[in-house]
Amino acid sequence: MKKDLLFWGTIISLGFLILLGSGYCQHITDETCSVQILVPGLKGDAGEKGEKGAPGRPGRVGPPGEKGEIGDKGIKGSMGRHGKIGPIGSKGEKGDVGQIGPPGPNGEPGIPCECGQLRKAVGEMDIQVAQLATEVKFVKNVVAGVRETETKIYLLVKEEKKYIDAQDYCQGRGGTLSMPKDEATNSLIASYINHAGLSRVFIGINDLEREGHFVYSDRSPMQTFNKWRQAEPNNAYDEEDCAEMVSSGGWNDVSCLITMYFICEFDKENV
């Protein structure tokens, strides 16, 4: 671009000088007309480097460059501000039972009370509770239902006791050990034993007061009816003073100290 400007500048200057020379020679005809033609000289040596020019105007924004490679991971920044509190979490599972803590301090002395009436009431309550517990236990030990006649009720007690204890057990509830005084009653008790799946029970017959003289548990004497098995009573080892009934309905004399189930008998009028 600079070379073109220099060339055309030289041509224009040369033309201007030619015009001036031709006009000047027309007025001076008698004199010799000399024409000077300026011709560009040879290219000179390179000049010294000029001073740095002023900054040019900003150019247009170039197109976006290509995406560079991922840089190295930066240093961990400082902790940011706390965020909002999150929602309440679900209930966790129940933890293990903790260790037993140390005993606490002794409490202050209580206020003295007039406990005479209270002790009396508590004592009466204890008696009632004990009686109730005994009755409940009695009911639990009664098995195979109830057997009865027109005047009697029979209960089989599933609790092994000695003869005397069994008798006291029945008497404590208003009855006595069962007394089979006739064939019908004896058959009913035998059926009761079979139905319960037992082999024998105590019945209310003994000769505790007089050897060989058997009476019922109400101390009434035995009449003509009996169901002694063959060779019974035999008072084996000189210690068999009480009676049992086996599932067939027969009687044996046995020791009063062994334990077995028993049947209580109650009068319907007293129940």
UniProtKB/Swiss-Prot annotation:
Molecular function via GO: calcium ion binding; calcium-dependent carbohydrate binding; D-mannose binding; DNA binding; fucose binding; oligosaccharide binding
Localization per Swiss-Prot or TrEMBL: Secreted
GO cellular component: collagen trimer; extracellular space
Residues where Ca(2+) 1 binds: 207, 211, 235, 240-241
Keyword Calcium: yes
Low complexity bias (residue ranges): 55-64
Domain C-type lectin: 149-265
UniProt cross-references to Gene3D superfamilies, sorted A to Z: Mannose-Binding Protein A, subunit A (3.10.100.10)
PROSITE patterns reported for this sequence: C_TYPE_LECTIN_1 (PS00615), C_TYPE_LECTIN_2 (PS50041)
Record-listed a carbohydrate binding positions: 200, 240, 244, 252-254
Residues holding Ca(2+) 2: 232, 234, 240, 252-253
A GO BP annotation: complement activation, lectin pathway
Compositional bias ranges of the Basic and acidic residues kind: 45-54, 66-75
Keyword DNA repair among UniProt keywords: no
Disulfide bond residue pairs: 170-264, 242-256
Keywords: Calcium, Collagen, Disulfide bond, Immunity, Innate immunity, Lectin, Mannose-binding, Metal-binding, Secreted, Signal
Amino acids binding Ca(2+) 3: 211, 238, 241
InterPro entries attached to this UniProt entry: C-type_lectin-like (IPR001304), C-type_lectin-like/link_sf (IPR016186), C-type_lectin_CS (IPR018378), Ca-dependent_lectin (IPR051077), Collagen (IPR008160), Collectin_CTLD (IPR033990), CTDL_fold (IPR016187)
Segments forming domain Collagen-like: 50-109
Signal peptide: 1-25
Stretches the record annotates as Disordered: 45-96
PANTHER family: COLLECTIN-11 (PTHR24024:SF14), PULMONARY SURFACTANT-ASSOCIATED PROTEIN A (PTHR24024)
Quaternary structure annotation from Swiss-Prot or TrEMBL: Homotrimer; disulfide-linked. Interacts with MASP1; probably triggers the lectin pathway of complement.
Similarity section: Belongs to the COLEC10/COLEC11 family.
Function of the protein: Lectin that plays a role in innate immunity, apoptosis and embryogenesis. Calcium-dependent lectin that binds self and non-self glycoproteins presenting high mannose oligosaccharides with at least one terminal alpha-1,2-linked mannose epitope. Primarily recognizes the terminal disaccharide of the glycan. Also recognizes a subset of fucosylated glycans and lipopolysaccharides. Plays a role in innate immunity through its ability to bind non-self sugars presented by microorganisms and to activate the complement through the recruitment of MAPS1.
Protein name per Swiss-Prot or TrEMBL: Collectin-11
